[in-house]
Amino acid sequence: MTVIERFKSNLKGKQNLINFGFILIGLFGCYLLIAWASYSPLDNAWSTASSVTHDTVLNKTGKLGAWLIDLLYAFLGNVAFVVPFVLFSFAIYALIFRIAEQWKWRNLLLQIGSFILLLIGLSGIASVLLPNSAYYLAGGFVGGMLQSLLNGIIGQVGLLLLSTVLMSIGFYFCSGQLLFSLGIQFYQWLFIKKPQSNTILEAANPHLNAQNNETTKSIVANPSENAHVDQLVTHENATEQLTDVSAFTRPTIHGLKSSSTLNTDKTKYNQVNAQPLTDPMMFKIEKKVILPKINMQHPENELTNLSMEQTNSIDNLEIRLPKVHLNTAVTNPEIKTVEHHAQNRPLEMPTQIQPVFDQPITPTISLNVEDQPLDIESNEAQLAEEFAAAEQMRLANMEQRAKAEGLEETFNQIITSPTLTVSINESSEQPTEKDLNPTHHDNGANYPKGYGKTLLHPLLQRNNVVEKPTTPLPTLELLAKNPVQTQQITEQEIFDTSHRLENALANYNVKATVEDVLVGPVVTRYEIKPAAGIKANKVTALANDLARELMFKAIRITEVVPGKPYMGIETPNTHRQTVWLRDVLDSEAFRHTQATLPMALGKDISGQPIVVDMAKMPHLLVAGQTGGGKSVGINTMILSLLFKLTPEQVRFIMIDPKVVELSVYNDIPHLLTPVVTDMKKAANALRWAVGEMERRYLLISHLQVRNIEGYNDKIDQASAMNFPIPDPTWRPADSIGQLPPPLTKLSYIVLIVDEFADLIMSAGKEVEEYIMRIAQKARAVGIHLILATQRPSTDVITGVIKANIPSRIAFTVASQIDSRTILDAGGAEALLGRGDMLYSASGSPEIMRIHGAFMSDEEVQRIADNWRARGKPQYLDSVVASHEDENDSRTNTITELDPLFDEIVAYVIESGVTSISGIQRRFSLGFNRAGRIIDQMEAQAIISEPGKGGKREVLAR
């Protein structure tokens, strides 16, 4: 490439042209500075031009420079030197701080107007305070005009005040904010203080500051509260390098936290760490510390005094303390304070100790046993009183519970039992060394007795025993509270990526500019505006090439940004944040949701929580390869329902071929059947769901409503009227009672299949038919389906399933073909894993990128245990019962034939009618009784099994 071509390439783009203009302004300012430095009033210039001085030019810049500087002196007087200095300084500042990157013409016009006000004010002040020269006025033509116009009206003092006001306004809006910021930063640097003012870019652009008031003012990295001191120093240094992004106007940045939030987080952090950072006695202990053992055997023994000597080495930390012998019934005496004579303050033993000084200091602690006496008798008396009060309170609570459950006699027997009386002599016996040392026990003799109340090892026990909660629903206290996370991204990083992105697109002949930037917890979206005539598919085809040039793992390009005429390019953040389930469930979107079946998925790319309604989906297909976060996403959906709904509102049928994914939910009261791990039983569960769907449709049709919401409203109305609705499908032969049972509200049913591919392989077409029927009809009766698979291939996700399940979620997949199989669109192959997903809602052409919420296995276990403590599940055996089981139950009733059996057999053989409805009409029987007679005839080989159309053949003719 030649020098001319390189020069032309550097001039491409608006920013480069503006920078070139700044260079010209700087050169012109330097030229005027030289002209001002060599100015002579005798030069042949504008104010002194004559034939006498025609050839007299002493100025180093020639006639042009002499004329220009003479004009400035003529108009501004002594203020003329300000113009060349400002032009030169402004050009240098604009090039150093890259003003061209956020250039706007209105800012230039504002600064030009402010500069003119500044010059007018300075000229007025000069005309009042400075004497006139023999060659020009002190304030020039401008100052003289102000004198002649305003001196007679407001006088010299008024003119001075007015000029000062004009100068102050012009100075502030022209460059005053910049100089103030520089002065504050210089002062803070001089006294080694951390800058707290706004950055230079923000100060130099007052309009941008006002425009972006609600955008982030600072970006900080919040270090861990328990980090090492040198890590804290590293974080502080990194924090000082982060700058404000609010003034970065092109592209506009959204999604960064406000300064108030960050300052609040920083204040909390400082409060938590105030003691370790300011206490010189804190030190880091890496050796094993032998905790003190207190001898309470004899009152005459004395408690030790502590003395601490600080040395200059950190080789060994040895603490030797006296032994412990417990004599009384109180086995855990508490030492509240120990006087530390070196500092005359209590010495606390922190659970986690951090160094707070540069040079390590090793404290040597020695304990002497001959200093201060300890009043053992008073402590023992106080502890005995506290123990007695606690024991009385415990017995009172036990008595109240016994009365509530009607077990007063049992309680009295327990209280009066002689085995519970413990003599003081036995409790005060001194324990032997064998008793104090558990390793001396005979493990072999105690092993058959089991572990507490069970013979199972604690780690092999499936469910933890939890006390019954008092709240109607689980609380968020079951989830761990995680530290607040902040974006660790700078304005410079955002601009550099934008600049590299524009250059990378230009390399492929795609002219586009970055207009907006949206910073999220996991990815950052750069919204670009392609030039006229550039098609969107030309940009999307460059995804892999752009990822390679920008050195990202993967990028995703969206053709349409909702509500904007831009395309979106999503790039991964260097420091990825974790989206915690507690943060999503604690959001306003989930707390105040009006959804019938609310499910929290995570957060979108802007960090906003996403909550969907399962009742409106109405079914969901989830696919993604191993490690993409599919199982965690399923757990997130289940836990969202468990936090919001009771077993009366929603019931689950869970199918888990992997055995370990959903087994943690066994025995929660929401289940209709234990978690199904056998694929044959899984097919039976789907078949039961189809039968339940038909039964519900029959009930809904009798109540003349259209869906489950209308049905439940009718039941509520009947309950309010105190007139329950009798079951319209009941027949006298269905039960022993003479009256039909009342109808009750129907709960929603959610079927969850964790590995759909395994189910298809084992059951095949039968399962697909059941799923198709459920997906087509079950929405109105409150039965919803969630299918998850690791293998998004066309033989698993068939066209029939896709047609009936419009709502889909795609986690990370291997290829674009798999992405199109799930979503009918690409993009899932460019996801980042660990919960990164694409969500396609039913009836919406938009595909939303969501970062799935994360929770630990312990949190899932705690929530399941919480529900198990609330009640036991009411399982239905018919859910997983097979045809053979039903046939066995039917054969047990065949021995007792119906009294009308012979008459109906004769009618069937004569007429050939084999349908239940025909038997009902002919003999005026109920549906269930007629069905039983048909089953009895089938068992006796009188009629055949139903064929394809449900028709039976008569075999006994």
Curated annotation (Swiss-Prot):
It comes from the Bacteria. Keywords: ATP-binding, Cell cycle, Cell division, Cell inner membrane, Cell membrane, Chromosome partition, DNA-binding, Membrane, Nucleotide-binding, Transmembrane, Transmembrane helix. The chain crosses the membrane at residues 17-37, 77-97, 108-128, 129-149, 153-173. Pfam families: FtsK_4TM, FtsK_alpha, FtsK_gamma, FtsK_SpoIIIE. One of its GO terms (biological process) is cell division. ATP binds at G627, G628, G629, K630, S631, V632. The keyword 4Fe-4S does not apply. It is a multi-pass membrane protein. One of its GO terms (molecular function) is ATP binding. Residues 607-820 form the FtsK domain. Residues 174-957 are cytoplasmic. It is found in: Cell inner membrane. GO terms for cellular component: plasma membrane. Consists of an N-terminal domain, which is sufficient for the localization to the septal ring and is required for cell division, followed by a linker domain, and a C-terminal domain, which forms the translocation motor involved in chromosome segregation. The C-terminal domain can be further subdivided into alpha, beta and gamma subdomains. The alpha and beta subdomains multimerise to produce a hexameric ring, contain the nucleotide binding motif and form the DNA pump. Belongs to the FtsK/SpoIIIE/SftA family. Homohexamer. Forms a ring that surrounds DNA. Essential cell division protein that coordinates cell division and chromosome segregation. The N-terminus is involved in assembly of the cell-division machinery. The C-terminus functions as a DNA motor that moves dsDNA in an ATP-dependent manner towards the dif recombination site, which is located within the replication terminus region. Translocation stops specifically at Xer-dif sites, where FtsK interacts with the Xer recombinase, allowing activation of chromosome unlinking by recombination. FtsK orienting polar sequences (KOPS) guide the direction of DNA translocation. This is DNA translocase FtsK. It comes from Haemophilus ducreyi (strain 35000HP / ATCC 700724). The gene is ftsK.
